Each structure stands twice: as structure tokens, then as C-alpha cells.
Amino acid sequence: EVTLTPQHGDGDEAVYAGCVLLSGKGGVLVHDIGINGTTYRHYAREDYIEQLALLEPELLIISLGTNDSYSYSFSMNSFRESLDRTIHLVQEALPRTKILLTTPPPSYFRQAHGGQHGRHRQSKASTVSYTFNDNARRVAAEIMRYAEANGLAAFDLYSAMGGEIGVEQWIQDGLIANDRVHYSVRGYERQGQLIAEALQAALGA
């Protein structure tokens, strides 16, 4: 049991952002930070990066881009600005931390049709269709371009999964959730395995 008691005077504000419990054992220490629906723009904040810097990570793996790309009104210019600002804030706060960018995996736009219900309307079953999200491919290409231009390590998860063609096999294997944006537990485990294998190859392990 852990009890936190803020110590502050009148008019002061205490903000709880999280805590880290260490076992004291050796080995690799991994922090997994993420919030559903976030984009590069959400992390491009000085206050957040300052908190991140307290962890003093040796390696920071940034896996974003799916939510950035999941919009019919997607703007590449806005994405570039958010990506660049996030990286610059990280580099300023964590100059000794190595950065690894990963690209978003393939995804689909989901559209529901029909299913009207009302007092004077005849209800009918709705149908769902899926359209491949080409913005994910564009974001993946931009992340790889940005990484090369700025001397950063990057792993192209989009291509490693086979892109628009290869993702069909992932669907057949049950590795993608029904919304075709998120992945199943096995799907995320497979993504993690691909990234881990790429890291091991880069480190010569």
C-alpha cells in the first residue's frame, strides 16, 4: 500500500502525474507510457517532456502516428510540425537519450451504413464497410524520411507488416481487432516481436 500526502501551502497547487515503483533488482527497466487516442501533437508539450526527462531513459521508443493519420482531413504539414516539435523538445530535455521512431501499422477507415431507427421509420440492419487508410502509408514514409534527415534510428513497422497487401494476412490470422484499427493481443505481441528483432539485429545480438 502506498499513501501520497502533498505538502503545499495556501494557494499552491499539487499535480499528481504518476509514480514509479522499483523492485531494486537488476535487468532492463521498461516504462510503457500511452493514452488512447493520442497523437504527436498531444506529446509536443514542454511540461510533459520535462516529466519524461525525470526517468532519464537510455533509449526512448516513440510509436505514434496511427491516430495522426486516422482522419479524412489529415494534413501532412500539421503532422510534420507536430513530429518536429516533439523530437526537438525531447532532444533538448534528454540530450543523451537515444531515440527510435517506429511507423504506424496499416489500418482501415470504418464506415457504417443504414441502421435508421425512429418512430415513423422502418428499422433496418446496418452494414459496415472498410476502406484502407492510405494516410498511414504517408505518415510512415514521412517518419522514415524525417529520421534519415535528422540522424535518428527508425523502424518501418508499416513495411515490416507488408503494407496494404500484407495486412490482409494479419486479418485472416485474427491479429487485427474488428475495427481494423487496433490489433488483438497476439497482434500487438507480434508487432513487439518485430521491433525487438530489429533492435537485436541493430545491436548485433
Per-segment meaning from a language model:
Residues D68, P105-Y108:
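Short, catalytically relevant binding-site loops at active-site mouths
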Residues H31, L100, A153-F155:
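Hydrophobic/aromatic beta-strand patches that form the interior of the parallel beta-sheet core
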Residues G34, T103, Y158:
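Residues at the C-termini of beta-strands that transition into short coil/loop
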Residues L94-K98:
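A short helix->loop->beta-strand "cap" motif at the edges of active sites that frequently abuts
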Residues E1-R85, E92, H182:
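Conserved SGNH/GDSL esterase-like catalytic core that processes O-acyl groups on lipids
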Residues I62, L101-T102:
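Structural beta-sheet core signal
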Residues R80-I87, A140, G192:
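Short, hydrophobic/amphipathic alpha-helical packing segments
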Residues R45, S107-A205:
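Catalytic His-Asp segment of secreted/periplasmic serine-dependent ester chemistry enzymes
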